[in-house]
Amino acid sequence: MTAVAAVEPLPYSPEQVAAALGGGWRETLMAAHRWMILGRALDARMQALQRQGRVGFYGAATGQEAVNVAAGLATAPEDWVFPGLREQLVALVRGHRLGTYVHHLFGDARDPALGRNMPCHPSAREVHYVSMSSVIGTQVSQAAGLGYALRLRHDRGVALAFFGDGATSSNDFHAGMNFAGVFGLPVLFCCTNNQWAISVPVERQTAAPTLAAKAREYGLEGRRVDGTDVVAAYRAIAESIGRLRGGAPAEMIEFVLFRMTPHSSSDDPGRYQPSDWMARARAHDPLERLEQWLTEHGMLDAAAKAVAVQRADESVREAIHEAESTPLPGPATLTEGVFAPSAPATTESL
């Protein structure tokens, strides 16, 4: 049996965290903790429901919560998010309703897309969260296009594109990065390098020393950040957004993290990952790292954690009950949102 490594501690004093997060840093950390617990509860329940045949598909974000929560907390309402498979927490932190997201997972009549998208492909117009595509890398060029529109409109918003290590080998990655570099657009490219593109290890993905190094060839600033460290992730995203909002050109951050679950509910990582992978991943569990720091500095105890876990679990179960009590979209909805209303033709319109 492989021994479980001790959790890697977050390397900060309270003063360093305050300098990184600014005023209200305690509230920011506690909010991050609550959201990460909710994400973990959502992942656990949805993976179980998928195995029971109650949800058709699910892609968990376990291990990526620090980046997702940091992005949700560091962005402003005018910013836009172009997600990959695992960024649902970004939408929730930005204000998307948990119940609405769960309706989407079930594809019921209260799903904004009326069941037309597969699970984990939501959109949330009210928080500028654009529907993802299963085609790898498309969000990179889409975010660049939105960045161009923001620049033309003199809009203060910033476009954030989230993609995995595998997407850096896609055509759209090249097109989007190059376009953003040429035109100096307000786009933050967030590469969540969980070290596996389904079964392909990152060392088979590129000969470059890092994925961040690719950004420099497009004339962009590129850097690596520990994606299991919520303080580092928040600081990196907030600083980049601040520069972009001030007129700086696009940037790329490579967040190095560990995928702690199968790629999706259709995957069996035991067939390709080394036997010690999960032990290494657990040593960098972003939730455990944050909880350890909060406990050591008197901001979290067992009772408070239990309350947070219970509330998150109740919220998820309530949303599931609401979704399972909702009927599926009826046949009459098939044409909703497909055809625009048309007025009768007149002589003037011909």
What are these regions (language model features)?
Residues 41-44, 48-183, 201-207, 212, ...:
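Cofactor-binding active-site loop characterized by glycine-rich and histidine/acidic residues
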Residues 1-67, 261, 267-350:
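Conserved acidic/glycine
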